Curated annotation (Swiss-Prot):
SUPFAM superfamilies: PLP-dependent transferases. Its EC number is 2.1.2.1. One of its GO terms (molecular function) is pyridoxal phosphate binding. Its main location: cytoplasm. (6S)-5,6,7,8-tetrahydrofolate binds at L173, G177, H178, L179. The lineage of its organism: Bacteria, Bacillati, Actinomycetota, Actinomycetes, Propionibacteriales. Belongs to the SHMT family. Keywords: Amino-acid biosynthesis, Cytoplasm, One-carbon metabolism, Pyridoxal phosphate, Transferase. The record marks H284 as: Plays an important role in substrate specificity. Pfam families: SHMT (PF00464). The gene is glyA. Homodimer. Catalyzes the reversible interconversion of serine and glycine with tetrahydrofolate (THF) serving as the one-carbon carrier. This reaction serves as the major source of one-carbon groups required for the biosynthesis of purines, thymidylate, methionine, and other important biomolecules. Also exhibits THF-independent aldolase activity toward beta-hydroxyamino acids, producing glycine and aldehydes, via a retro-aldol mechanism. This is Serine hydroxymethyltransferase.
Length: 491
């Protein structure tokens, strides 16, 4: 296999061809609102000169970015391909069909719904797909109605009460779940009577026996599996066994690790597609596409999910669906599979680099793309302080709660870091070991400032003189060896 750190000549050729178009585009924007053109240029500069370690971020290819900037943005297309509420949607039908075909082929799914604008939209669509299939459709049959519009007011009130009487379980936020998995402040926590499962307090690992115990006791309609900050893989075959035992639907949110599924890093019991009836994902993150979402289902749920509009959504973002199709086509290549494997390998290298320097990691390592650092135990800092100090040094991360977090969900005790973005730039294990050194150097030089109570504060901090600039310079030198969008010169 060729050196993964070498610049792809095809990518450079594309960038050089697109550079004049981007320069012209920015000049045109500047004539209307120069501050937006300036911010766009500044964002590229910032991304080129920062160590992007946010696990949910990546770099989409220039063809994907270019696809979003077309007149597809102007077209309304409520409905699905061939069944629109607007005329003149034949080209949108083509785009949506191609994107869905790529999604099914890439993941081995029976059906794909590619309209959701985001991961949250995908999860909402999935929840209501399940409710429509298991609650609404049987009720319509019971009441002798074809659609909800045909119900009497009494029957409609009965159905609404049934909707509101359903149960779901998902991974708790501090254990690594997502806010859409039943977090009370989120709409998902208000839609369902909800309970959360966590992780083993000693190991930080998912305890399947505890999940099964909760499911038997609570008897949910939906069991949500998946995570946003859990640094290990999930056995979806076990989760399906639990769901089947209690008559629940298994819904998997693979937004964070979809790229590792697409790239064949997660296979067998770790691949959710053969085991879950409903799977949601974003199309960015590790999948490296545009910002958006998808729902993949078995054929039994196809008709229900295709009613995402008007059930949850309105008009799809046609220009983004087109970009999804391009990104999914890219993900079907061997180049992407090689990339996905490097993402996982690099995450292990980063974990080893951090642990050998004395950093405490939740679960003592990783086998996906995420590392979760306990910065309170390791450095006496809150996640908020560590996040801000690292940003001062040109290292972009996000604070994150850890299991039974003593600092709560706002200040947190952890930071979450991931390898997809820097792997896209060509970083390998040696570079990620250097990244570990830069992180530790920064945080060892950071101390909490005293609060008005006389105790160490949770927000303010100070970094030893010169350390932030030293780390920033070292990061910039490292990044210079792996240019972002090489050949894209906007000067």
């Amino acid at each position: 296999m060729s050196d993964p750190r070498a610049v792809d000549p095809t990518a450079r050729d594309i960038a050089e061809k697109l550079a004049p178009a981007y320069r012209t585009m920015l000049d045109a924007i500047a004539q209307v609102e120069p501050r937006i053109a300036e911010a766009t240029r500044a964002e590229l500069t910032d991304q080129r000169h920062s160590l992007k370690l946010i696990a949910s971020e990546n770099y989409a290819s220039l063809p994907v970015l270019a696809t979003m900037g077309t007149w597809f943005s102007d077209k309304y297309a409520e409905g699905t391909a061939g069944h629109r509420f607007y005329a003149g949607c034949q080209n949108v039908d083509t785009v949506e069909t191609i994107a869905a075909e790529h999604a099914c082929a890439l993941f081995g799914a029976e059906h794909a719904y590619v309209q959701p604008h985001s991961g949250i939209d995908a999860n909402l669509t999935a929840y209501w797909t399940i409710l429509a299939h298991h609650i609404e459709t049987p009720a319509l049959s019971e009441f002798g109605a074809r659609t909800v519009n045909d119900l009497t007011q009494v029957d409609w009130d009965t159905l609404r009460h049934r909707f509101n009487d359903q149960r779901a379980i998902g991974m708790s936020l501090d254990a690594g779940g997502h806010l859409t998995h039943g977090f009370r402040p989120n709409i998902s926590g208000k839609m369902f009577d909800q309970r959360s499962y966590g992780t083993d307090p000693q190991t930080g690992l998912l305890d399947y026996d505890k999940v099964a115990e909760l499911a038997r006791e609570f008897k949910p309609l939906v069991i949500v599996a998946g995570y946003s900050a859990y640094p290990r893989r999930v056995n979806f075959a076990k989760m399906r066994e639990i769901a089947d035992e209690v008559g629940a639907v298994l819904m998997v949110d693979m937004a964070h690790f979809a790229g590792l599924v697409a790239g064949k890093v997660f296979t067998g019991d770790e691949n959710p597609i053969p085991h879950a009836q409903v799977v949601t994902t974003t199309t960015h993150k590790s999948l490296r596409g545009p910002r958006g979402g998808m729902v993949l289902t078995t054929k039994d749920y196809a008709d229900d999910v295709d009613r995402g509009c008007p059930m949850v959504l309105g008009g799809p973002l046609s220009h983004v669906m087109a970009a999804k199709a391009v990104a999914l086509a890219e993900a079907r290549t061997q180049t992407f599979r090689d990339y996905a494997q490097r993402v996982a390998n690099n995450a292990k290298a980063l974990a080893e680099g951090l642990m050998k320097r004395g950093v405490k990691l939740v679960t003592d390592g990783t086998d996906n793309h995420i590392n979760l650092l306990d910065v309170t135990t390791s450095f006496g800092l809150t996640g908020r302080q560590a996040e801000a100090a690292l940003l001062d040094a040109g290292v972009v991360t996000n604070r994150n709660s850890i299991p039974t977090d003593p600092n709560g969900a706002w200040y947190t005790s952890g930071i979450r870091i991931g390898t997809p973005a820097l792997t896209s730039r060509g970083f390998g294990p040696d570079e990620f070991d250097q990244v570990a050194e830069l992180i530790v150097t920064t945080l060892e030089a950071t101390t909490p400032m005293t609060a008005s109570t006389g105790k160490p504060g949770k927000a303010k901090y100070q970094i030893a003189d010169g350390v932030a600039q030293k780390v920033h310079d070292a990061a910039d030198e490292l990044l210079g060896n792996f240019p972002l969008y090489p050949g894209l010169d906007l000067a």
